[in-house]
From Swiss-Prot:
It comes from the Eukaryota. The keyword Ubl conjugation applies. Its main location: cytoplasm. GO terms for cellular component: cell cortex; plasma membrane. This is Liprin-beta-1. It comes from Mus musculus. It is found in: Cytoplasm, Cell cortex.
Length: 969
């Protein structure tokens, strides 16, 4: 701005100088033309005037010497022209009278020049002022620019801080979600611990009450022992008096026989004396009978005390189970040796003594059955006191009718109590087994009596040897009955079933076997194995036995109470019979009777009709029309080759041949597996669950069942037109989930449960529909329908390392530019699958040959080259072994039993273990079962007592106790 103003000012001044110079030159003009006119003739002379003025100015400035020197340098011609010109008198055509006009004009121009100079000075001042303002404005502009830059920097910092805050917010939200999950898990654990503590507190209170009762019973026992000791002393004195009286009676009888002929009067006196002595003996016998009643009462009290004492001893023996068991058994043995030997040997011999003892038994027996489950079960574990009683020195014989009636009364009481206890809900099976032990023990106590010695008196009835029980009698009945006894106990331990559980038929059969153990073992085994002869039973015993059989007849509710499988006949169908509605309620249960009868017969001996019906059950009934004439028996299928199946039966489908071969192998194997129970209809529903319903037609045509899923190969899937890599991996992980859950039919989760406590093990069981529900719960409902038919389920999400968030986002069709949505999906996906699965997926992504899993990737079948054509058969065999899901996947975790909470590792007895128990010898099996039963009761007691009962119970497996008992046998 300033430079432009300066230029304008300089141009104006130059113009003014030119105007002034032009006005001076007009004095020499003739006034005809204006000097400013472009056609003026003075434009060339104006220059000459300027040159002359310049010359004058220069000459005035020069000195004389310089002037002389300059003049010498001027050419002569130039000097002559100048002199001639200067001496000319012409006025250049101007009249002398026009000089005033030019003078006025010159004055006016001078005035204009001065005014212009003033204007120029004013303009200069204005220009300077404007320059100052311009400088101020430029300074303000710089300040505003600096402020703008500072504001932009602050804006950038604010954007960076906001981005970091957003990231921190997402991290905090993820942390809050983790904390919520942890809080839910902790809350669940707290509730579990509270429930466990509440149960434990009640059990501890019950144990304390039992201890108080034991202390009270201990005091009563001491009193009873004192009474028993005094009663024994009195009994000994009475026996001595009785011996003396017997000897005296014998002596008097001998004298009476010798002197009857000669001494008639003395005979009469002696008869009177004998009558008096007989009356005295009768009074002694009445007193003896009263003592016997007291002894029987003491014996009943001691038996109840022993039943109450044994569980307390087991509960107090927490530090050493074996010591507690030995202590309880030694106490019972000591009581039997000290208190029961003389009692059983001093049983009354009069006929009237049977009914009072039975009445006393009937009055005291109901009190025995008011004990708890543990109290009722433990006495059956202890060694019977029969051997100890027989080892003592008996003094009095036992009347047969009395002992038999007493045993029958006890048997009836045991059976009646067993019937009343069978209506319980949670402990029915345990009570049945315990009542069985009581029944057997009381029967042995009532019937197995010791023989008398040589000091028996003649007035007492003679000994009947037939009622002496053999030492080798099996207290658990036959081997089959014992196995059912063991199975009942193991089923009690293994599950939480109640008496109303769906397994009805087996429960009834088990109940009847338990009830009839005493009868079957005595009727079949005792007659052949007892070394002592059996006397014919009395009429009273026959009545009692018929009463027992009548009682068992009332208990028989269905045909499952039959004990001999050969005697079972197929009943004809009738409506309204027992268990008419059991089939629909059992769900997955099969026809137990038919399956058992089929398994009893080898498949090679099956008839043609059985084989055909079996093929129809397998879904291969379409081949019966062409191959029915070829099938003779089961042996035909067992010996058939691939060519025979294809030629004779017309099975062209390779999967049908494989299905038949696997089914035949399963029939030949003794192992019972759950995948053999899943038919092809279940597999089609399973395809819906894992999100692959498009293959239902192919799987249904191939009759793919659970066994074929377990042994499914890659070639099998390719033959079923499954060529997608993603679908192969989906089926692979779905089979692995089935193995982990032991091929349970309903292991997959189709509906949401508790969203706050989801674990990766539960996510493994999610179906495709459940995954879509999860997407809706995390605000991705608009993308959830894209998973239909994709094969995405919980097992694929958790177990497959190649399946990650990127694959999930591609399957959901989330665009790559929606980074917030993908980040949101990644956050919830990682929270869902857990840290371990995240680590596996991260390791898989770091591998050098990692390729992102997509829905378009295809499985390339292996091709055989001509170089390997010679080993074609070998190659086919090796390729056939390439399973979709390798056998090692899911086996380790699949062996664990389901149905228990985490942390409760309870070992269940399998069928092989029970069959192994059945194959034991009689004596060894009895001892081992008693040991296992006692060990199980000990473990249950410790579970109820200790705070960490679940972990301790896992450490004390019943199998270890059986092994210890085997080593001690």
């Amino acid at each position: 701005m300033m430079s432009d103003a300066s230029d304008m000012l300089a141009a104006a001044l130059e113009q003014m100088d030119g105007i002034i110079a032009g006005s001076k030159a007009l004095e020499y003009s003739n006034g005809i033309f204006d000097c400013q006119s472009p056609t003026s003739p003075f434009m060339g002379s104006l220059r000459a005037l300027h040159l002359v003025e310049d010359l004058r100015g220069l000459l005035e400035m020069m000195e004389t010497d310089e002037k002389e020197g300059l003049r010498c340098q001027i050419p002569d011609s130039t000097a002559e022209v100048l002199i001639e010109w200067l001496q000319n008198q012409m006025t250049n055509g101007h009249l002398p009278g026009n000089g005033d006009v030019y003078q006025e004009r010159l004055a006016r121009l001078e005035n204009d020049k001065e005014s212009l100079v003033l204007q120029v000075s004013v303009l200069t001042d204005q220009v300077e002022a404007q320059g100052e303002k311009i400088r101020d404005l430029e300074f303000c502009l710089e300040e505003h620019r600096e402020k703008l830059n500072a504001t932009e920097e602050m804006l950038q910092q604010e954007l960076l801080s906001r981005t970091s805050l957003e990231t921190q917010k997402l991290e905090l939200m993820a942390e809050i979600s983790n904390l919520k999950l942890k809080l839910t898990a902790v809350e669940k654990d707290r509730l579990d611990y509270e429930d466990r503590f509440r149960d434990t507190e009640g059990l501890i209170q019950e144990i304390n009450d039992l201890r108080l009762k034991v202390n009270e019973m201990d005091g009563e026992r001491l009193q009873y022992e004192k009474k028993l000791k005094s009663t024994k002393d009195e009994l000994a004195s009475l026996k001595e008096q009785l011996e003396e009286k017997e000897c005296e009676v014998k002596r008097l009888q001998e004298r009476l026989v010798c002197k009857a002929k000669g001494e008639g009067i003395e005979v009469l006196d002696r008869d009177i004396e004998v009558q008096k002595m007989k009356k005295a003996v009768e009074s002694l016998m009445a007193a003896n009978e009263e003592k016997e009643r007291k002894i029987e009462d003491l014996r009943q009290c001691l038996s109840r005390y022993r039943k109450m004492q044994d569980p307390a001893v087991l509960a107090q023996g927490q530090d050493s189970e074996c010591e507690g068991l030995f202590h309880s058994s030694s106490i019972s043995t000591l009581l039997d040796a000290q208190g029961f030997s003389d009692l059983e040997r001093s049983t009354s011999s009069t006929p009237g003594m049977g009914s009072p003892s039975r009445d006393l038994l009937h009055t005291s027996a109901p009190e025995e059955f008011h004990t708890s489950v543990l109290q009722a079960s433990i006495p059956s574990l202890l060694p019977p006191s029969v051997d100890v009683d027989t080892c003592e020195k008996p003094k009095l014989p036992t009347k047969p009718e009395t002992s038999f009636e007493e045993g029958d009364g006890r048997a009836i009481l045991g059976a009646a109590a067993e019937v009343s206890l069978s209506d319980g809900v949670s402990t029915s099976s345990l009570q049945k087994s315990s009542s069985l032990g009581n029944l057997k023990k009381e029967a042995s106590d009532g019937t197995d009596k010791a023989p008398t010695d040589s000091r028996t008196f003649g007035t007492l009835p003679p000994k009947v040897p037939g009622h002496e029980a053999s030492v080798d009698d099996n207290p658990f009945g036959t081997r089959k009955a014992r196995s059912s006894f063991g199975r009942g106990f193991f089923k009690i331990k293994s599950g939480k079933r109640t008496a109303s559980a769906p397994n009805l038929a087996e429960t009834e059969k088990e109940t009847a076997e338990h009830l009839n153990l005493a009868g079957t073992s005595r009727s079949k085994g005792s007659q052949g194995t007892s070394p002592f002869p059996m006397s014919p039973p009395s009429p009273d015993s026959r009545k009692k036995s018929r009463g027992i059989m009548r009682l068992f007849g009332k208990l028989r509710r269905s045909q499952s109470t039959t004990f001999n499988p050969d005697d079972m006949s197929e009943p004809e169908f009738k409506r309204g019979g027992t268990r008419a509605t059991a089939g629909p309620r059992l769900g997955w249960s099969r026809d137990l009777g038919q399956s058992n009868s089929d398994l009893d017969m080898p498949f090679a001996k099956w008839t043609k009709e059985q084989v055909c019906s079996w093929l129809a059950e397998q879904g291969l009934g379409s081949y019966l029309s062409s191959g029915k004439h070829w099938i003779i028996s089961g042996q035909t299928l067992l010996q058939a080759s691939q060519q025979d199946l294809e030629k004779e039966l017309g099975i062209k489908h390779s999967l049908h041949r494989k299905k038949l071969q696997l089914a035949l192998q399963a029939l030949g194997s003794e192992e019972e597996t759950n995948y053999g129970k899943l038919d092809f209809n279940w597999v089609t529903r399973w395809l819906d669950d894992i999100g692959l319903p498009q293959y239902k037609t192919q799987f249904d045509e191939g009759r793919v069942d659970g066994r074929m899923l377990h042994y499914m190969t890659v070639d099998d899937l390719l033959s079923l037109k499954v060529v997608s890599v993603l679908h192969h991996l989906s089926i692979k992980r779905a089979i692995q989930v089935l193995r982990i859950n032991n091929f349970e039919p309903n292991c997959l989760r189709r509906r949401p449960s508790d969203e706050n406590s989801i674990t990766p093990s539960e996510v493994q069981q999610w179906t495709n529909h459940r995954v879509m529900e999860w997407l809706r719960s995390v605000d991705l409902a608009e993308y959830a329908p894209n998973l239909r038919g994709s094969g995405v389920h919980g097992g694929l999400m958790v177990l497959e390392p190649r399946f990650n968030v990127e694959t999930m986002a591609q399957l959901l069709n989330i665009p790559p530019n929606k980074t917030l949505l993908r980040r949101h999906l990644a956050t919830h996906f990682n929270l869902l699958i857990g840290a371990e699965a995240q680590h596996q997926k991260r390791d898989a992504m770091e591998l050098p040959d990692y390729v992102l899993l997509t829905a378009t990737a295809k499985v390339k079948p292996k091709k055989l080259t001509f170089s390997n054509f010679g080993n074609l058969r070998k190659k086919k065999h090796e390729d056939g072994e390439e399973y979709v899901c390798p056998m090692e996947l899911g086996q380790a975790s699949g062996s664990s039993q389901k149905g228990f909470r985490p942390g409760l590792d309870m070992r269940l007895y399998e069928e092989d273990d029970l069959d192994r128990l059945e194959q034991m010898e009689d004596s060894e099996g009895t001892v081992r079962q008693i040991g296992a039963f006692s060990e199980g009761i000990n473990n249950l007691t410790h579970m109820l007592k200790e705070d960490d009962m679940f972990k301790d119970f896992a450490a004390r497996s019943p199998s270890a106790s059986i092994t210890d008992e085997d080593s001690n046998v």
